[in-house]
Amino acid sequence: MATPIRWNQRGRVAPYGGSKRTDTPLRSLALSLTHVARAALSEPYMLTIEHKRIQLSRLPKTFDGFRVVQLSDVHHGPFSDREQIERAVETANRLQPDIIALTGDYISKERHYAAPCAEMMGKLKARFGVYAVLGNHDHWTDAALITDLFRAEGITVLVNEGMRFEKDGAAFWLAGVDDSMVGLEDISLALAGARDDEMKLLLAHNPIVLRRAVRASVDLVLSGHTHGGQVAIRGERATTRPRKRLLKGLWRQGNTQIYVNRGLGTVVLPIRYGCPPEISLLELRSK
């Protein structure tokens, strides 16, 4: 017959009846694993706001302080429910952004989640609009359906295309590429029409685009896809290998910077550890 257990005042497990047991390495390991499991199951609900100031030498002074809120990898489905997403939308709106950038993977694989996800994304509010690109999961599900639903909600979906973003006589180029993993990314097409000397902001789901963005003289790339690793065993900068280095946060290669958002949802398992879901508040500063 199993012995009931309780937590004593020091956080150790002891049997009812008053007798104390000496901790063993195995018991300590079991407690540690229990703690990790609880943290991993609760962390997907621990929404965080990452506020970064990004210096851009070609950003016109008119846009100094321009606020971009980025959301990524919503993955609406069994692991990412309406309550989580609606809370993220409300949080994003409270940040009063100039634009909102959505960087792909809105659903995981079930088409019936597309319409409610689009409805929730349609409640995002920004001074100059909401802009989106598609991710690999969107293509694996139904990219055309998601694109149509988002556009019906007033969201500008950029599919290898760009536009000149103008304000008070100043401008920069805002572009978005289709997903790299499905072989549809075309930076040249997205930047067609951009002037050589103007600041270029690129939305791309997969950060693997970075090297091509550098060659195309893009100033800033906003990406997602990685979920920050979803489970982080090592420190954030424990490795210098390029692909590992681009799991999350702000990085630079040459004159190009990239910000990789950890995303809101999860895949495979509904867990996160050391990688809480993120809303990015990116404040663009001119040098």
Where are these regions (language model features)?
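Active-site metal-binding loops of divalent metal-dependent hydrolases
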Residues: 72-76, 104-106, 136-137, 161-162, ...
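Mobile, glycine- and charge-enriched loop segments
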Residues: 46, 51-80, 177-204, 209
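Membrane-embedded segments
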Residues: 62-156
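Conserved beta-sheet core of the metallophosphoesterase superfamily
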Residues: 152, 207-284
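Binuclear metal-dependent hydrolase catalytic cores centered on His/Asp/Glu-rich metal-binding motifs
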Residues: 148-155, 159, 167-204, 210-211, ...
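Conserved acidic residues
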Residues: 98-100, 105, 198-201, 219
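Beta-strand-turn-beta hairpins that frame and shape the catalytic cleft
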Residues: 47, 56-69, 155-156, 163-175, ...
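Acidic, histidine-bearing metal-coordination/catalytic regions of metal-dependent phosphoesterases
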Residues: 1-68, 78
